[in-house]
Amino acid sequence: MKNFNLTHRIVMAPMARMRSYGNIPQPHVALYYCQRTTPGGLLISEATGVSETAMAYQNMPGIWRKEQIEAWKPIVDAVHSHGGIFFCQLWHAGRVSHQDCQPNGESPVSSTDKPFADDPSNEFTPPRRLRTDEIPTIINDFRLAARNATEAGFDGVEIHGAHGYLIDQFMKDSVNDRTDSYGGSLENRCRFALQVIEAVSKEIGPDRVGIRLSPFADYMESGDTDPKRLGLYMAKSLNRFEILYCHMIEPRMKTVSEIFECRESLTPMRNAFNGTFIVAGGYTREDGNKAVAEGRTDLVAYGRLFLANPDLPKRFELNAPLNK
Ligand SMILES: Cc1cc2nc3c(=O)[nH]c(=O)nc-3n(C[C@H](O)[C@H](O)[C@H](O)COP(=O)(O)O)c2cc1C
């Protein structure tokens, strides 16, 4: 990976913990990340909110306030002291939120005002469609959050463009029903994502920027009628900005946890993108090795296996038994 001296290809996938009380990461999280750090290993943080309106769920961390930046510093330092490379995943939940998580109890914002079709326990508040003139403010929130992440010491940021959150709500045609320059054609639907990438890259340098995408997933009612075209368009467009990496979720992961039989592959996107490619979703030691050996990816991110096995790289090296 350009400018980073990785010693192996096993990446810790971003995983929300929901233990950041008051949206401030707590000191105990340093231990959690350090347990999963190896010298020259890449870790991606839990989803971290870029602003007050970005938030959802309980106790997710943020990185828009001074207090949050200060709280991240010793955590990032701890990972660095173990030789790790640490990227902060920048997140805006969009409509996957509830008014109780929003400033002044307002509706969450989205590309649309469509509520979830299937939300029996009213987990989510119907969203308010962002006006075209409000969109630059959200892009600016990502830019400032990236600056804050570098101030906190992170080596770079991963823009969360996956899993039905705000950026995905713009990209996917089942969600985005806009009629302005951010809706309709594929080019228009991807405009927001690409403007975020551009702003963040200009702020901290493209060599410190990655993005996570899940064109094939329909998690949080975020399916697309032509995911291959979407994934390919994004992979090609990213080259304009020369960002560090593109992290894609395997088509077999329709949600974040269920694995489906699937014939689709990420190879066209991998071939279209010029930077480092990372895959994630249901990988084992064996098929991770196979994906690398066959040239289908550069790096493989592991989620649940890393959660249950903090020393995952060592266990893979020894081919040792794994905790479930
Ligand atoms: C507890 C948990 C929290 C997660 N939180 C995030 C997150 O904050 N951001 C994200 O992009 N993906 C998140 N994911 C998805 C994982 O990064 C990963 O893509 C998924 O678990 C599939 O990979 P795996 O089969 O190796 O676990 C989460 C998954 C789990 C299990």
Swiss-Prot record:
* Entry EC number(s): 1.3.1.-
Gene3D superfamilies the record matches:
Aldolase class I (3.20.20.70)
Q: State the source organism's domain of life.
A: Eukaryota
Any one GO MF term held by the record is: FMN binding
Where does the record place the region Disordered? 99-128
Stored Pfam families: Oxidored_FMN (PF00724)
UniProt feature, compositional bias: Polar residues = 99-113
| Keywords on record | Acetylation, Flavoprotein, FMN, NADP, Oxidoreductase
Binding site residues for substrate: H160, G161, A162, H163, R252
Could you name the active-site residues?
Answer: Y165
Residues holding FMN: P14, M15, A16, A47, Q89, R212, G282, G303, R304
Q: Which cofactor does it need?
A: FMN
Q: Which residues carry this modification: N-acetylmethionine?
A: M1
- Class in the EC hierarchy, top level: oxidoreductase
Q: Which InterPro entries does the record associate with it? A: Aldolase_TIM, OxRdtase_FMN_N, Oye-like
- UniProt-listed CDD domains: OYE_like_FMN
What does the protein in this record do? Answer: Putative oxophytodienoate reductase that may be involved in the biosynthesis or metabolism of oxylipin signaling molecules.
Please give the family membership noted in the entry: Belongs to the NADH:flavin oxidoreductase/NADH oxidase family.
Q: What is the protein named?
A: Putative 12-oxophytodienoate reductase-like protein 1
